[in-house]
Amino acid sequence: MRHHRTVLPLAGYTIQQIDFDPATFQPEDLFWLPYHASLSGWGRKRQAEHLAGRIAAAYALREVGEKRLPAIGDQRQPLWPTPWFGSISHCAQRALAVIADRPVGVDIERRFTPQMAAELESSIISPAEKTALLRSGLPFPLALTLAFSAKESGFKATPAANQCALGFADFQIVDITASTLALEFAEQRYPLHWIASEEQVITLCALQQ
């Protein structure tokens, strides 16, 4: 599958970005994944997205001298080789991956339009969180996209044993600035950093062990 790699530094971490062309994907492209047989029943689009994410993950692991690839869990989540933590995200024809020595989550989202923000607001944030978003001075659709993405990143950084029953309401946006956000979950503060383009936002959450 044809793809292009870009390296994005953010908050001291290196995000591997893969822009890929799903039209060039062939099923045999999956053969380099040890578990490729388990993907045979997936749709072509999903297979291409999965491959792009694992390509990004391979580059991320290579940065720390790790040759093993993430395995795949029973919920299709990546299982990172010990002692590393990692995270993968997809949006359209782009995949991201990051590796760290501590729990980490990365997320990429397409920026909400004003109409989408109006429709989705109540399912993403509480009235108190809306106050925090409005206080940031950012355009509300951008701030809401960041809130959505931050909660996704926070979820990914949360230990797997605690993820099962979590929803957006469990993570509270308490602060947002021109480059950072803060979530609260179970009396713990989750620090995040973000960057944005005209079309997308990326958030990164790294926790202390």
Model regions and ranges:
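Core catalytic alpha/beta fold that binds nucleotide/phospho-ligands
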Residues: M1-Q209
